[in-house]
């Protein structure tokens, strides 16, 4: 006889797993960069590469790409290399981070919503 396993809980990461946040992250990071005088034309694909280690590292990665580093190279920033290794000053990074936090705080749910099928999945797990 086959025994069915029953779980009492399921744990998910919200950002990028349950919720599709990439549009709001992209708009917010570009606006933060624009407000602080930096390159502000990053695509959703670029921004997907920037995030994963928090907003601070994402801002630093954007500044490194602005300096000419590849997405592959900046993937090491915040993991095995510091922002200083890419010539990113604390002053520049902190300005972008502050502008991002302020803008994203006001616009974090402009386009964010659950990925298709997520609500049905959660109801099924209930």
Language-model regions: role of each:
Residues 1-3:
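Eukaryotic N-terminal low-complexity, Ser/Thr- and Lys/Arg-rich leader segments
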Residues 5-14, 18-119:
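N-terminal helical cap/lid subdomain that shapes the substrate entry/recognition surface
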Residues 118-126:
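Catalytic-core regions built around general acid/base machinery
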């Amino acid at each position: 006889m086959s025994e069915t396993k029953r779980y009492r809980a399921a744990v998910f990461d919200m950002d990028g797993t349950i919720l599709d946040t990439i549009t709001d992250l992209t708009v917010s990071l570009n606006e933060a960069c624009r407000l602080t005088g930096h390159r502000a034309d990053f695509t959703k694909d670029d921004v997907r590469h920037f995030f994963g280690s928090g907003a601070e590292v994402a801002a630093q990665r954007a500044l490194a790409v602005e300096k000419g580093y590849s997405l592959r190279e900046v993937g090491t920033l915040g993991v095995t290399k510091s922002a200083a290794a890419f010539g990113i000053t604390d002053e520049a990074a902190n300005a972008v981070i502050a502008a991002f936090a302020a803008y994203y705080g006001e616009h974090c749910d402009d386009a964010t919503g659950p990925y298709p099928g997520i609500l049905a999945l959660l109801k099924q797990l209930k």
